Amino acid sequence: MGQCRNWKWGLESFDFSINRRSSAPGQLESASQMRESWRHKAGRRMFSCPEESDPIQALRKLTELCHLWLRPDLHTKEQILDMLVMEQFMISMPQELQVLVKVNGVQSCKDLEDLLRNNRRPKKWSVVNFLGKEYLMQESDVEMAEIPASVRDDPRGVSSQRASSVNEMRPGEGQASQELQTLPRVPALSRRQEEDFLLPETTVMKSAPKALRPKPTLEKDLNVDREENTGLTSPEPQLPNGPSVVGAKEGKEPKKRASVENVDADTPSACVVEREASTHSGSRGDALNLRCPKRSKPDATSISQEGPQGGATPVGNSESPGKPEINSVYSPGPAGAVSHPNGQEAKELLPFACGVCNKRFTCNSKLAIHMRSHTGERPFQCNFCERCFTQLSDLRVHQRIHTGEKPYTCDICHKRFNRMFSLKCHKRSHTGEKPYKCKDCNQVFTYRKNLNEHKLIHSGEKPYKCPKCLRAFRRPETLKYHQKTHQETTAPRECEG
């Protein structure tokens, strides 16, 4: 019988999916059309085929009922598919989720998915005894916690049989507390009862008697829910002694409640923390800074900055070297638009400075890797050719030359590469992309290396010199070819040019 009641509830709660559809674009169905649509739907649900009946006639009858319900002459294939999927979804879901879907007026699977995704956070539900019947309702925690005494003392026909009527449940999980599981099934509401009772739910809850008031433990539940909603993972810091802390110990709500009560359910957690932090100052503000969600770090970029010469010294927090200050983390901006700060701001965001070239870094590990370029240290050695590298990642890429491993494949010509960067550059031969442009002559190149060599033509620089004849060249390949001329002759000869 429990499954039967749940089945009926699912049918009636999904009645809106047909009645709210328009028979013509821009027109709502009339009351007679709504009743007719529901009659055909109910007839299809209650259809049964006796054993002695003709199965062909039963098939035709069932086809006719489904046609009258789905109306393929008025609805599209997507609408019909949504109707079938949502009906089965409503039949198999718990009652509290059926109420949530019906109150929000969901009419398509896409809207239903958005509703379920946005309602995964903990909600408060209550069982209300009204006119001898019990109803499952969703309520506002803060509004229930602050109902005026003059309003609470007026029962106005609401029964006070349930002393603890507020029970936590998660609609996305479809689980209720033990008290809700022992209650009888919520009766199906007609359309008129739904409009008279479910819609003005705040009015009914404001007039609730003392039996429906939250107990003092509700304050603790509200705090737990708010911490879960904001998604804070860091532990709560120990607050210093102050008026707000003393008021909280005595059972009084601190003033921060005023800044959280008016926050909408869809407000991002970061905005809630920022709004809460803006109402405090002094030591309380410092404590709230520790609760802010972790911001994204800047890219692995270094900024050249004038600084004192010497060893690698972190700038910023002198008490805890190797860790930047929490308050110095900046708000993340749009991807690809990271601005490079200067001066004091650069020291706060990039606290670790190189004492040789004054480049700055976000963490000490990146600085240690950079210092190897000055000291010449190469701690990672290849087991095959004994070649050394400054980073372990470079060693792993190099070892693919010996092992023949090429994990990256071009999806166009199926050519394989041992580095992702090589594959990225190779794809430009298929797409014709030339992202590097010369500022002097507007000539474009496929690779940065070719652009750098081209710039030497405009500057006239020749950085590669022959150690024997001191002749200079722009490209290293040309220098190697030139050096072969010295090896071919036993006696060195004077180079021309």
Swiss-Prot record:
Stretches of the chain forming a coiled coil according to its record: none
GO biological process, one term: regulation of transcription by RNA polymerase II
UniProt entry tagged with the keyword RNA-binding: no
Stretches assigned to the SCAN box domain: 41-123
Organism: Homo sapiens
Chain intervals for the UniProt region annotation (Disordered): 148-342
Pfam families for the chain: SCAN, zf-C2H2, zf-met
Localization, UniProt: Nucleus
SUPFAM superfamilies found in the cross-reference section: beta-beta-alpha zinc fingers, Retrovirus capsid dimerization domain-like
Start-end of Basic and acidic residues biased regions: 216-229, 249-259
Protein name listed in UniProt: Putative zinc finger and SCAN domain-containing protein 5D
